[in-house]
Each structure stands twice: as C-alpha cells, then as structure tokens.
C-alpha cells in the first residue's frame, strides 16, 4: 500500500545518486512526478532518459513557476534549501522534503540513525558488521553507500543509516529506534550561517526517536528534545550506569560497560583514542537494539577501519604513514592528531591543507604543538592554517601531495608517523577526498 497521495504532483530536485533513487521509488509507487537539476548535464541524466523516457526533466537554472506546479519538492542533499528558487516555491505553498523523510515513512524494521561531524561512516559500518555477526538481516546506507530508498525491503530486520546534516534538513520525523549525534564541530560553514544552525540541523535526527546515544564528552551531542527517553552514553572516561567507556585494571586498558570490562583495548586492530571512542559508540548503539556482546566484540576484534580514515599504509625507515584524507574539517583532523599522537612513541609530521570551507583553524594550534614535529601545508587555504598554527611547530609549504610526502619523510624521525589529515575539503586540487587519499598512498608507496 502506498503512503503517498498519488493524485498529487511531485518534482525531484537534483539528479545525483539520491535523486535517482527517488525517481525509482516514485515510479514504483505510481506517482506523477518530474525532475529538475541546476546542472546542464547532471550525473544520472542518461540513466533517467534511458529508463524513464516519459519523465519530464528540466536542466539548468531552476524555474520557480515550474517548481510551483508541484505539491511537494523532494530536494537532494547537495542543493541548499536556501537556494532562492526553492525558497520562493516554499513561500508559495510548496512543501520541501527529501528521501530520508520518505524512507522513514516506509521502513518497517527498526532504524539505527547515526550522524555527527566526524566518524559517522566508521561507526555506521561497524554497527552494520556487528548486526550481521549477530545474524540480523541488516541494510546499511543512507549518506554512506546505498541511498536509503534503495534499501527498503520487507526482508530487512534492521536498518543502520548514516545521515548528513543536509539530509536531515528535509526530514521532519525520522522515528528511529535509536539515534545519535556522535560529535559536533564546525563543518560546512560555507552552507550554514554558523555553528548553531548546523547544530540544529544535526539534531533533527532525534525527532521521534525511541532511544538516544550521547557522547558524554561532547555537550553538543545531547538531544535538544526527548527528555525522559532511554539514554546510553559513551566516552573515553570511566563509565557509570548506562555508560560505555574505558576502565583500567592492572595496567591494562579495557573497553567497558557500566562496571564490567568487555575487552582489552590492545585487541583492537585500529589505533588511536578516536577509534576507541568509535568502538564504544558502536557498542552503545548495538546494545540499544539488543545485539549480543559476543557478536559485537568479535566484530570489533576483526575491524580494520575504512579507507582514507586514519588508515595505516606502511612503515618505511622506522616511520609509519597514515591516510586520513576523509578528515575534511578541523574536528576530524583534531581527532586524528590527538588520537594517533597519544598512541605512538614519537611525534607526528602533519600534512594539511585544501579548501577550508570557511572554517576556523585556531583549534589546531595546541594539539599540533603537543603532538607534531612539523606541519607540511598545501592547497588553497594553506596560509590560513599557517597563520593559525603560528610558531607552534616548524612549517613547510608545498604545491603537491607528492612533494608533501617527500619532505615529510625527510622531517620524520624513527618512531614518528606521517599523517595526512587535511582539516579541509579536497575540491581545490582533487575530484574528491578519495582521489586525494589515493594520490597520497601512491606517493607513500614510491618512497624508497
């Protein structure tokens, strides 16, 4: 049975990955719709014309009168709701919605909903692996991998969804079984008026949630709504009731729940305090939906991390090389610098820079001074980072990732680690952060 009123007209705005999933979904529901995109040649245009030749599509500047033919616009997350044409249509009574709102209406199985400025892909993947190890028929996606609407199936027993602030802007009621904001730090300041607006967008994830998971060391992760809901916490401190954290016994550090040690930290294959926090967050989310500890701990012991996320590449001349190209904001870079820096015997040589998206880099100064031997800077906002770091460590400016690797190898000493953690987006020099990470990995491989 369709939950969409079929005699109304919709327009899908944005023909990328999520937009195409909306097209497939609406077509299967028998709904009348059209498509619009600000780009002249959007990524999925050929697919749309091949599979749905009857669907009207408008490319280029958005036509407000065309948009106002619809009762509802399904806006892809890549397009800001502040876009004038969307605002004008909304002012004339057209509802703005998105794919996650539709997903929430149709999903029959419980949903674990995960957002945060950093670590959401790692935690989402890890929880999905835990659920699979527990024998659940689990579907994992959203902002990560498969679009939400493509995951819908009566066979699914549990959904694990990574959600971005952009997706949550068009989601009124998610109704997750358990929801979390892993952490909040400045990101996408080129799209938001400031941190409060970004914070409010993230916290839409808690609307209708039955349980919440809170980062006990980040006050901004605590829900603005939902007092009285079951609440589980995680953090790198000693846990108390309903809490996941770290306990120390006889010189050994353990992942723990309440007053019980679960497993030694040394058994994790991923290094750094930030990865310990990710493991604890995943345990809290899994526990909230009843996943058994034996399956969750077995998954933790096997988890080797995700590509481009503080990923160990190789050891060369006593120096370890880590690819954290996914660190596209200051908060992510801070997590890697603090987490890895406190976990190695030597110092870090940091490679950073790119498109800062209007971020404030001043928060990097203290941890860089504490954990780094030097910083090698590149990209559009290298000078802004240099100004923020001041005289905290020696600075070197280069033009390419290859040069950054070569100079970092000379600066590093035995026992050190070279860390690519840019604190910036990659689009000033690369197609995406994945390409940046691959170029870095290739340069590291070429060291001899």
Swiss-Prot record:
Listed name of the protein: UDP-N-acetylmuramoylalanine--D-glutamate ligase
Summary of the function given for this chain in its UniProt record: Cell wall formation. Catalyzes the addition of glutamate to the nucleotide precursor UDP-N-acetylmuramoyl-L-alanine (UMA).
Stated family: Belongs to the MurCDEF family.
This enzyme's EC code(s): 6.3.2.9
Keywords from the UniProt entry: ATP-binding, Cell cycle, Cell division, Cell shape, Cell wall biogenesis/degradation, Cytoplasm, Ligase, Nucleotide-binding, Peptidoglycan synthesis
Catalytic activity: UDP-N-acetyl-alpha-D-muramoyl-L-alanine + D-glutamate + ATP = UDP-N-acetyl-alpha-D-muramoyl-L-alanyl-D-glutamate + ADP + phosphate + H(+)
GO molecular function, one term: ATP binding
Origin superkingdom: Bacteria
Binding site for ATP: 116-122
GO BP, sorted A to Z: cell division; cell wall organization; peptidoglycan biosynthetic process; regulation of cell shape
Subcellular location: Cytoplasm
Pathway(s) this gene product operates in, as recorded in its UniProt entry: Cell wall biogenesis; peptidoglycan biosynthesis
Pfam families reported in the protein's UniProt record: Mur_ligase_C (PF02875), Mur_ligase_M (PF08245), MurD-like_N (PF21799)
GO cellular component: cytoplasm
């Amino acid at each position: 049975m369709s939950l969409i009123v079929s005699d109304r007209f919709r327009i899908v705005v944005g023909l990328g990955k999520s937009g195409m999933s909306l097209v497939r979904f609406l077509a299967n529901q028998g709904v009348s719709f059209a498509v619009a995109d600000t780009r002249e040649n959007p990524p999925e245009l050929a697919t749309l014309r091949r599979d749905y030749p009857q669907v009207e599509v408008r490319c280029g500047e958005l036509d407000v009168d065309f948009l106002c033919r619809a009762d509802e616009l399904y806006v892809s997350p890549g397009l800001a709701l502040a876009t004038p044409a969307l605002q004008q249509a909304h002012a004339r009574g057209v509802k703005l919605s998105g794919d996650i709102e539709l997903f929430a209406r149709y999903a029959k199985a419980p949903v674990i909903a995960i957002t945060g400025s950093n670590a959401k892909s790692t935690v989402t993947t890890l929880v999905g692996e835990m659920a699979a190890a527990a024998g659940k028929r689990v579907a994992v996606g959203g902002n990560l991998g498969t679009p939400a609407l493509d995951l819908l199936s009566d066979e699914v027993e549990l959904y694990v969804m990574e959600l971005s602030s952009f997706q949550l802007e068009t989601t009124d009621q998610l109704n997750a079984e358990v929801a979390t904001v892993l952490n909040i730090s400045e990101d996408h300041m080129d799209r938001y008026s400031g941190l409060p607006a970004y914070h409010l967008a993230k916290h839409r994830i808690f609307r209708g949630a039955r349980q919440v998971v809170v980062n006990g060391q980040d006050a901004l992760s605590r829900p603005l709504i939902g007092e009285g809901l079951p609440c589980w916490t995680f953090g790198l401190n000693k846990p108390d009731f309903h809490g996941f954290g770290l306990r120390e016994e006889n010189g050994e550090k353990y992942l723990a729940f309440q007053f019980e040690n679960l497993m030694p930290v040394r058994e994790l294959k991923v290094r750094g305090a930030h990865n310990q926090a990710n493991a604890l967050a995943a345990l809290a989310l899994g526990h909230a939906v009843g996943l058994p500890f034996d399956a969750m701990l077995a998954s933790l012991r096997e988890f080797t991390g995700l590509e481009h996320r503080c990923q160990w590449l190789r050891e060369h001349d006593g120096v370890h090389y880590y690819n954290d190209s996914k660190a596209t904001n200051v908060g992510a870079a801070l997590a890697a610098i603090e987490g890895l820096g406190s976990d190695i015997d030597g110092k870090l040589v940091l490679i950073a820079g790119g498109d800062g998206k209007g971020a404030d880099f001043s928060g990097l100064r203290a941890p860089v001074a504490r954990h780094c031997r030097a910083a090698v800077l590149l990209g559009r906002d290298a000078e802004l980072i240099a100004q923020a770091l001041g005289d905290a460590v020696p600075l070197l400016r280069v033009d390419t990732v290859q040069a950054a690797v070569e100079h970092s190898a000379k600066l590093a000493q035995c026992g050190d680690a070279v860390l690519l953690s840019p604190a910036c987006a990659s689009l000033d020099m690369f197609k995406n952060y994945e390409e940046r990470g691959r170029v870095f990995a290739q340069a590291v491989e070429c060291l001899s």
